[in-house]
């Protein structure tokens, strides 16, 4: 009885190793993640703890990426949270959370979506926890941010950029 479809017996080793031991297969990995900047402001404490009205919450975020070395990139996820009521600002939390990503043999058309969609998706739960803890440590109930569809936002911005490029007449860029 032959196991022709068995993963152990069908390793596709016919091609052999790449000359000189070169590894040409694409690889992406998270090297490290860290808080680059964290600011918590509680400008109206302790009076703000007595405010009865529900505050308005504003959450803004931004994503940036830069090459540190040819195969290492830094993704920076900035999240700013402001809680305001009629009586003033309760708290402001500003976080810059980063990840170092190792990328080897990844084409640019695949690296860009990873750096601006998948990478932030990986980092977000950790940033979310830091913000919840910072708000709690400021004396308020922990703030649990809603999940963000980074892939959907990336695709939306890509479509907008393509539409803008198509609307701009040639020679007027």
UniProtKB/Swiss-Prot annotation:
InterPro entries in alphabetical order: SecB, SecB-like_sf
Record key words, sorted: Chaperone, Cytoplasm, Protein transport, Translocation, Transport
UniProt GO BP: protein folding; protein tetramerization; protein transport
One GO location term (cellular component): cytoplasm
Subcellular location: Cytoplasm
Recorded superkingdom: Bacteria
Principal localisation: cytoplasm
MF-aspect GO terms: unfolded protein binding
One matching Pfam family: SecB
Coiled-coil annotated residue ranges, if any: none
Subunit description: Homotetramer, a dimer of dimers. One homotetramer interacts with 1 SecA dimer.
Annotated HAMAP family: SecB
Family to which this protein belongs: Belongs to the SecB family.
Described function: One of the proteins required for the normal export of preproteins out of the cell cytoplasm. It is a molecular chaperone that binds to a subset of precursor proteins, maintaining them in a translocation-competent state. It also specifically binds to its receptor SecA.
Name this polypeptide is given: Protein-export protein SecB
Species this protein is from: Novosphingobium aromaticivorans (strain ATCC 700278 / DSM 12444 / CCUG 56034 / CIP 105152 / NBRC 16084 / F199)
Phylogenetic classification of the source organism: Bacteria, Pseudomonadati, Pseudomonadota, Alphaproteobacteria, Sphingomonadales
Gene symbol of the encoding locus: secB
């Amino acid at each position: 009885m032959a196991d022709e479809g068995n993963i152990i017996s069908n390793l596709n080793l016919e091609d052999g190793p790449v000359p000189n031991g070169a590894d040409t297969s694409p690889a992406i990995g998270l090297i490290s993640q860290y808080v680059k900047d964290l600011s918590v402001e509680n400008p109206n404490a302790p009076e703000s703890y007595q405010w009865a009205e529900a505050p308005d919450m504003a959450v803004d975020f931004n994503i940036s990426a830069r090459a540190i070395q040819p195969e290492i990139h830094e993704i920076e996820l900035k999240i700013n949270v402001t809680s305001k009521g009629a009586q003033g600002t309760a708290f402001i939390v500003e976080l810059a959370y980063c990840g170092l990503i190792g990328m080897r043999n990844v084409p640019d058309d695949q690296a860009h979506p990873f750096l601006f969609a998948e990478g932030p998706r990986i980092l977000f739960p950790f940033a979310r926890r830091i913000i919840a803890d910072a708000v709690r440590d400021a004396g308020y109930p922990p703030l649990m941010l809603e999940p963000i569809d980074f892939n959907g936002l990336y695709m939306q911005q890509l479509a907008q950029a393509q539409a803008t490029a198509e609307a701009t007449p040639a020679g007027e860029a």
